[in-house]
Each structure stands twice: as structure tokens, then as C-alpha cells.
Amino acid sequence: MKTIISLTSIPPRFRTLPAIVYDLEKHQDVDEIWVNIPYKYNRFPDTEVVVPDFSPCSKVVVNRCTDYGPGTMYMGPAHSEKCDADLMIAVNDDTKYPPQLSSRLVELYRDEPAAWCLSGFRIEEYINNNGGVRRYNNEYVDVTESYGGVILNMNWLRRMKDSFLDFYKLTYNDDIIISNLLSKMNISKKYVNNKHVHVNTAEQI
């Protein structure tokens, strides 16, 4: 199955973005790394978008697209006719991910096709514990978070792309939108503790 990593960014972070992408290419076993950069940013309407130089990276696909806020990492490839991937691993642009994260997530997906994540929570527990959540393993969650990395079937994203736009008008919280639409499609969302996939915790930089 063709697997891509997908992320997006904003102009203030472009200076560090090439190093993040290079680190992903060096340590993650995927076919392509999609860097989704909007033509224009809703948050930065007067900023001229100058795409960073990714020439040292052989797997990078720079996808110029519409701005869907943080959800651009999901919707950029979903709306692109050039994207022929089977699986996507969504990650953040300000996080250093542990080696082998992608291969571990693919293994989990092959064993059980679900939206597997290394960061997520159950809404009731999150509310009752004032944002504190316990670390699950191989258990369901209500919300997957791209911070820790989440693997999704591209067909799921293609099916939800029109509905995503309706929700996007109400909130920029891409994790909530994606998780809600996965639930509507009866797709399981499962959390795996990083200790059980033998990878280190993602490190925000």
C-alpha cells in the first residue's frame, strides 16, 4: 500500500520547515512526504507565500492548495487528483517524530484497519479530568490528534472531504472534525501507547 506522510505549515514556521521535512524523510519509511502549502492563507491575507527550498529531499511533494486551516494536512491530498496514496500519516510541522513511527503505524493498520494514533482522548474523561487523560493502549478514543501521528485510509478522507468543508465553517479544530466524521462512517479510532510500539514519544520543538 502506497503510504505518504502529510503535513502543512504557516509562513512564520517556513524557516524551520525544511529541517523538519528532511528529518521525516531520513527516519520514516514512506513513499512520499506531502507538504501542503496554500496559495493564500486566511490568517495571513497580506503575506506573499514563498515556498521553502526542499531540494535536499527526494520524496517531497509540494502540494499547492486551498487553505483549510490546520486541516490542510488532511484535505490537501484528499482534494488532489495527483494523490494516489492508499494510506496517510498526518503529522505536525513543529514536532520531531521518533524513527520507525510510520512503519509501526502501518503494521497496526494492516492488522486492524482503524485510525490508529499515538495521541488522542475520550471526551468525557477529558472534561472530567480538566484536560488530563490517561494513556491507553489498543483502546478506542473519541478524538485522534495529529500531534502524535495518526494513520488514515485515503479513501476515508476522500469520502469526507465535502462534509469537512461544512464543519470547517464552524471550527478550525481539525482533530475534532476528522474524528467526528470518522465516527459517522463507523470507522474505529484507536490509541496505541508508544511503549507498545517501541518508539519514543514525539518531541515538540
Specify the residue positions occupied by each region the protein language model found.
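C-terminal catalytic/acceptor-binding lobe
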Residues: M1-T3, P11, R15-I20, L165-I205
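Catalytic phosphate/metal-binding cores of nucleic-acid and nucleotide-processing enzymes, i.e., regions
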Residues: M1-Y22, K40, V62-R64, M75, ...
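Hydrophobic targeting segments
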Residues: K2-L7, D23-L24, D31-N36, M88
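Short beta-strand/turn micro-motifs composed of small residues
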Residues: L7-S9, I37-Y39, C117, N193
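Short, acidic, metal-binding catalytic loop of nucleotide-sugar glycosyltransferases
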Residues: A19-E32, Y39-N42, D53-S55
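Active-site-proximal specificity loops/subdomain of glycosyltransferases
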Residues: N36-A85
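Conserved catalytic core of nucleotide-sugar-dependent glycosyltransferases
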Residues: P77, K96-D166
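Short beta-strand-to-loop acidic/aromatic patch adjacent to the donor-nucleotide binding site
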Residues: D84-K96
